[in-house]
Every structure is written in structure tokens, then in C-alpha cells.
């Protein structure tokens, strides 16, 4: 690995430790040429998961799309950015744990709704209205009835 200060290619590891979530190793290195220290991170390469859309098109899974959808659904609601990121992280982790190469966008949408329902019911209804393409007020009322019953 090249030193970011002098581009020398040899270094020694001074310290190694796992990050809090145990998915990455943080290493402190010292350049054998200029003796400056720098940090590197080592992570297992993820296998890309493809999302199968309604029209059967495929695209790489993108956690940011989940975060953006949640931000819109949670606007002006008491849901923090951290809660939104936690939901997206939990969904990403759940998909990764399935060890699949493809997942239907429908399944991801259902996961988002399940998590969002536990955090804020208004945000859940907002997300569901877009995701399930509510056609009229009766569809909203039906979803709210289901929410109250459960």
C-alpha cells in the first residue's frame, strides 16, 4: 500500500483493531520511508445483490435509495436521521444474511414498511401510499384500519 505522504510502497502495521460493528479492521500504518503514520480500513468485499424490479429489470442494491424514500416519508415527523439510517442498515444486513444474489423490489418495500411501522405509523402510511400506489381515500382508510386492528 502506498504511503499517502511520499508514495513509498512499504509500511509496517503499528496497530490493528476491529470497528464497533466487527465488519471492518482499522489499521494504523507507519511508512518505512518517511515514518509518517496513516490509517487504512480492511473490509470483506460484498457480493453485489441485484434488485429485480416490477418490469423484471435488474439493478444493483443501493441503500441510499431506501434512505431517500424514508426521508421523504418521514418529513416533518419525529424520526431522526439516525433512525432512518438504522432502518436502512438493518434491511441491508437482512438482505446480506439471506446470502442471495437477487431480491425482488417488492420484498425490500415490505421490509421497509415493517421497520417503519415500528418507528412511526404516520410515516408508515405515507410510505405505503406511494409504495402500494393508493388510488383513493378508501385505500388510505383501509390501511389505517389494518394499522389500528394490529
UniProtKB/Swiss-Prot annotation:
Pfam families: ATP-cone (PF03477), Zn_ribbon_NrdR (PF22811). GO terms for biological process: negative regulation of DNA-templated transcription. The keyword Transmembrane helix does not apply. It comes from the Bacteria. A zinc finger (unnamed) spans 3-34. Belongs to the NrdR family. This is Transcriptional repressor NrdR. It comes from Clostridium botulinum (strain Eklund 17B / Type B). The lineage of its organism: Bacteria, Bacillati, Bacillota, Clostridia, Eubacteriales. The gene is nrdR.
